[in-house]
Amino acid sequence: MLKKLLSLVSLWIPLFLYAQGVTISGYTYDGLTQKGLANCRVSIKTSTMDTLLAQVTTVLQTERTEENGNVFVYQNTQIGALFMLQFNAPISAQAYHLVIEKEGYESIEKIISAKSLQKERLDLGDFYLFPKRKDKILGEAVVKATKIKMYYKGDTLVYNAGAFNVSQMDKLKSLVAQLPGTELKDGVLKVNGRPIENLMLSGKDFFNGNIQAALDNLPAYVVSKIKVYEKAGDMSELTGRNMHDKSYVMDVKLKREYIGTWIAKLQADGGTSRLWGSQGMLMRMDDRQMFTANFDANNLNEKREMSEMGDGADLFLAGRFKRWNAKVNYFYEPNRYWRFRTEAQVERLQSLLNEQSYQQTFFPSKDLFNRSRQQNKERQYTTNAFAAVRYRFKKQQHELQYTFRFGHHRRQSEKIALSWYDSITTQNWATISLDSLYAQEKDKSQTPLLFSLFHPTLSKQVENVHTLSLASIYTLRKNVLKTYLRYQAMTENDTHNENYILTRYTPVSPDWRRNYIKDRSQAQKAEMRAEYIWKVAEKERNNGELTPYIEYKYNHGDATHSLYRLDWDSHFATYDWFSKLVDISSISDFQASCMDYNNSYNSTLTEHHSAIGTQFNFQHKTEKGNVFDIRATAETSLAHRSLAYLRGGLSHHIQCKSWLFTPNLTLKWEEGNTEDQRWLSSAQILYKGTPRLVNMLHLLPVRDDSDPNNISQGNQHLKNAWEQNLQLLYQSRHRTMQHLWLLEAQWRHVFNDFTFLSAYNSRTGHRIYTPQNTNRTHWLEGATSYAIPLGKAQKLWLTAKLSGDYYQGEILSYIDGTALSQNQLLQSLTITPQLYLTANISSKFRASVLWSTALQSVQQPQATNNYRTTRLRSDFTWQLPWDVELQSDINTLIYKGYSERSINQTAIRWNASLHKYFQLSHGTLSVGFKVYDILHQANSLQTSIDQFSRIENYTNVMPRYALLSLVYMTNWSSKKRSKE
């Protein structure tokens, strides 16, 4: 009996010593060739090296591809050789010893803590094994792995995600911002100066071309590699030939263990100043389908992440926003024939914006100044839906798409404005508060004030848009026929209520009125296009095609604009008139007496646009591998437009027929990638000519004085405009040192550009706008940058950049009684030097520092204004012991030369946060504490300058606050794991 008990105890002891089964995975590469290295022996032992827990051999991954109906199976050497160690982790072990060995290569050893194995899975990323040197004496020396950040595989740029520092809660956007050569600005993602046209996920267009959605939703820790390359389009895939339809894409490769895995995230925020937020995400992706669902509700101005390195968003977000958003996306590709995509989104946005504006209008004799304060309250509801189905059969492809949009927008605002001419008396008025200035001047018999305006408004807008399209591709031997059909129907209903209290400090009588405006419009658009791609050359070195095409567009729209006006009368109490907005629910009672027939109208616009053109594509490869690309397009079109317009009892009928010519030319050169070259260069020159049609409403001989301060009238002599755009892009990179030099330049000129002649009344301050043509509008932009890694380990990257832009516009503003000066130009020149340093010191620390100074000079005939804005930004993320993460960022803006003296100073926004991560049995919990604007100096300033005026806007911003955040992230697999 005793022997049986001892036997049972001996069987149970290992079950307690080995607590749970874990899986450790990773990839092995040849450190020189950057290819997957198979047959490496990977062993895991206890830290004392006395017990071997598991041992496997790395293997290359097998992939399938289909081309012309044939299935090819091959081993992919570009994604690394995989190893997966499965074993039971002993409770008594304090650490584990991982050894990677292969004959002829330096071995790699890595210590793994027991705490890191609390999860069921652990991905170690990529390991690069280097061949042994012949003169090295083999001993017990251990070679530590160095992760290579980036390398080129042919024309494909590959980033190793494991070599960059990302926290457990970072999104893909944070990882992409660290990649050398990438830039994310104004919603455009660029790599080496070239815009990314699409973001793929394991080679599939899961996000339907929405790059921002991919950056904001995909967790960074699931990414293995990021590849940037030119991807062949649908025509090339169907024909198996080069059809010149490549696009520049970023392809995100997931770690193998997360394919087929559900990923979920929940977040809750609460802080001072009554701030709150909640966020959730659910996602799953495999080889055939992807599902994502997320929601977000917060009043944090949508600035939810602590610090995203390289983020180009505004430093100080204006206004206060509350946002509720929910979105579902599904992609399914069951086989090579069918593909389904669908997306639905519902959003509610509520905002409060307090804005102060300072405007200086340029005149030859004296300038006009205007100061205003305005509060805007808005509520928006939008619903967007999208569905698409694609079918491929043999040599055909058809894709049907449907989109729907519903929007409801309500806006209420209150505005007060003062206006005066420049004089000695008014020199200091920019520094006096608006209310004090009004109280000081309103009762004076002699005041420099020109007028004051109180203007509360209430508007509502409802719109519906339906769009249906069908795109088809037919392959005819070596050639391709493409067709495209599209139909769109849109309706919009607007209502607008306003009190308009205009007081003039001149002998002219004041203008006090109430307006009610009702707009109804509907439009239908149809489009048809057919093109035939004819292969004229198909050789290894010469490949070309000629594409004749025809296109037809139809547009028909009806609009009704009804204006009801009620002038002030003595029986209205002044208090009610000033403070209460008119809310006319039924206009039938006074429709006949209040209708403003002179400013109400009905219009019907019909457009027919027919085009015929030819596109020529040709590619030539030299013996040395240099590539020359030519793409030329010539299009001739006829635009026939008619406008029926009824206003003030008068009927107008206008017809315009315009012959248009649209040329495009792109020349591209890429240097061949040969072993004897140190530098690889490429250049691109693009010219584009675009005709711009005149607005038919501007041709009408009518006068609109519904706004007594801004009167507009038509010009029957307006001509069509012609825009020319010339761009140059040159880049050169060093093969081994990874230095990158970029040069960009762009020139734009508009012949017969559309602008407005502004005539100001010196007594009343009202202005009359008349559309005009001008030939003196020019833009010139340029930038050059040089990026280098500091050190062989590429832990530091420095980018130096110098950019400049020049704008020239003709001044067409004058005061009545003075002649319009000829050849008066406004010229604006801005030069901006910039330095940007990023650092990934280790897997625990990353940081970035940016400095830039924008030097702007604005010249007009009587004055020259100089502005300077210096921007300093630094941030870091430091992963401390005990799973604690510290983040901080400091953003500094230094203003000089602005009218408001209070702005000409230094504004610093300093944020900091601390996160503690808890590894739970089924996920990760993060507890974070964040302090925003520690020094309480954040502000918002926006400026704009053109040939008419200079405008400075100052808006309210987020207050200083402290925020507590709880984030829980987990993942689980729906696959059944086999026991081995």
For the regions a protein language model found, what residue spans apply to each?
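Structural motif
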Residues: 27-38, 51, 147
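Short, acidic, small-residue-rich periplasmic hinge/interaction motif at the N-terminus
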Residues: 29, 43, 99-103, 121-162, ...
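Short, acidic Ser/Thr/Gly-rich low-complexity loop/linker segments typical of extracellular
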Residues: 50-84
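Primarily recognizes Gram-negative and organellar outer-membrane beta-barrels
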Residues: 66, 209-212, 232-274, 288-980
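A short, solvent-exposed loop/turn motif at the edges and junctions
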Residues: 78-112
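Short, polar/charged loop or turn motifs at beta-strand boundaries
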Residues: 156-178, 191, 201-206, 267-272
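Extracytoplasmic beta-strand/coil segments of soluble accessory domains associated
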Residues: 173-207, 225, 234-244
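Short acidic/polar hinge/loop motifs at secondary-structure boundaries
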Residues: 205-232, 287
